[in-house]
């Protein structure tokens, strides 16, 4: 939930944030390590917490996860290499990294085979391609149970409109491939994501139990996948992690009784661990009136923070004055916040479908700063070079100390691959 920048229970305070642009430039991503540790602790009942690093793949964040005993999920060769760079070691800890995908390219296939990284397969073809190269490989099956859930159609990870997972009626074909190549089945993974919809979560847990029983194979583990929500707006409900665990643990116990031995329970959070830990600081560069609309234009665009333009996602916005004047209780103006891109959709205050909306914000002027809250997940990791704009620096606070964990990309680096 968006926190006040004048609260001292995190390092993401107005005082701390205002000193960063002078040192690191603007815009800049900022994270608080203590918030990440707090979120990890909330899931301590699960046997394995496996971070979906696509949410925030900076290797310094991954090192923090590893130090807290969190394992990692990788969805590309690049993410495998990031995990290795962060100190995860599949040679000494075979379950440190799991590779999850619906397809596997040749380079990734060779790397997971070389390192014997367990593969969470979302297609029968992928299983067969792996088995031909690496017989006996350890595998998970990502199952699509025929229904889904998500905050946007673009984030729905189940049902017939989703590309993800092996369709539940194709599990016999998957088993044929497993047996043909003597693959070792570790477990079944079901990533649907229910947030605070506990009735839907019960449906997911029930589907997991049914799939395991009907599949008729022994398993070491089940994975609840990800999809734990965080409250992006004031008044939104936070997920009850005790209740969430309780429903999944009941499913795990049913499966363990059926199989006749203990079964590990994994969870694969992404946004839950990092979303609330991050903010994006951006500077106001222009204020103008467009008919009845009051626009504030900032130096960050959707190339930096994609979620509002892509999903219509809400991020709370706070204003900080550059000259020290107080804006905390200042009168507000209905404001459209937009970026610098040569693109009409470069608006941070929009709904899904692109409808522009306003926010009640204090009146600001060029040189002031806006802070976009809860950007720790799918912020920096979804950034692009659109409009030939360099990637932003990332800064991590830990116990009051700020350190650079990614420097700003230069224009020279942006051009380097084309200077042949």
Swiss-Prot record:
Residues with PTM N6-(pyridoxal phosphate)lysine: 54
Which EC class heads this enzyme's classification? lyase
Catalytic activity reads: meso-2,6-diaminopimelate + H(+) = L-lysine + CO2
Give the source's domain of life in one word: Bacteria
List its EC numbers. 4.1.1.20
GO terms (molecular function) for this protein are: diaminopimelate decarboxylase activity; protein homodimerization activity; pyridoxal phosphate binding
Q: Keyword set for this entry? A: Amino-acid biosynthesis, Decarboxylase, Lyase, Lysine biosynthesis, Pyridoxal phosphate
Matching HAMAP family: LysA
The name this protein goes by in its record = Diaminopimelate decarboxylase
Organism this protein belongs to? Escherichia coli (strain K12)
């Amino acid at each position: 939930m968006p926190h006040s920048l004048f609260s001292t229970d995190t390092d993401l305070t107005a005082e701390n944030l205002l000193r960063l642009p002078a040192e690191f430039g603007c815009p800049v991503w900022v994270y608080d390590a203590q918030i990440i540790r707090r979120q990890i602790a909330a899931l301590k009942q699960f046997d394995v917490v496996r971070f979906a690093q696509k949410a925030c793949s900076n290797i310094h964040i991954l090192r923090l996860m590893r130090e807290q005993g969190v394992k990692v999920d990788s969805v590309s060769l690049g993410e495998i290499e990031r995990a290795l760079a962060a100190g995860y070691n599949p040679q000494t800890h075979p379950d440190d990294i799991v590779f999850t995908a619906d397809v596997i390219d040749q380079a990734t296939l060779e790397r997971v085979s070389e390192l014997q990284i367990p593969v969470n397969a979302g297609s029968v073809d992928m299983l067969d391609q792996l088995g031909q190269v690496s017989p006996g490989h350890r595998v998970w099956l990502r199952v699509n149970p025929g229904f889904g859930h998500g905050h946007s159609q673009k984030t729905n990870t189940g049902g017939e409109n989703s590309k993800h997972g092996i369709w539940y009626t194709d599990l016999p074909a998957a088993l044929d491939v497993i047996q043909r190549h003597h693959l070792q089945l570790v477990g079944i993974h079901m990533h649907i994501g229910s947030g605070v919809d506990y009735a839907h979560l019960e449906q997911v847990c029930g589907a997991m139990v049914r799939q395991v029983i009907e599949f008729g194979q022994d398993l070491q583990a089940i994975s609840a996948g990800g999809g734990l929500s965080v409250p992006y707006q004031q008044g939104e409900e936070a997920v009850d992690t005790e209740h969430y665990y309780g429903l999944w643990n009941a499913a795990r116990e049913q499966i363990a009784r059926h199989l006749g031995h203990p079964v590990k329970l994994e969870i694969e959070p992404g946004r839950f661990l990092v979303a609330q830990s991050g903010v994006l600081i951006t500077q106001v560069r222009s204020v103008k009136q467009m008919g009845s609309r009051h626009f504030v234009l900032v130096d960050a665009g959707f190339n930096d923070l994609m979620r509002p333009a892509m999903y219509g996602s809400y991020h709370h916005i706070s204003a900080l004055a550059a000259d020290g004047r107080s804006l905390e209780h200042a009168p507000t103006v209905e404001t459209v916040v937009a970026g610098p891109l040569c693109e009409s959709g470069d608006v941070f205050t929009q709904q899904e479908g692109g409808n522009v909306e306003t926010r009640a914000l204090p009146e600001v002027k060029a040189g002031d700063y806006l802070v976009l809250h809860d950007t720790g997940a799918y912020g920096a990791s979804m950034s692009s070079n659109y409009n030939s704009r360099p990637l932003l620096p990332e800064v991590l606070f830990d116990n009051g100390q700020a350190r650079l964990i990614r420097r700003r990309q230069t224009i020279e680096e942006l051009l380097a691959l084309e200077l042949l």
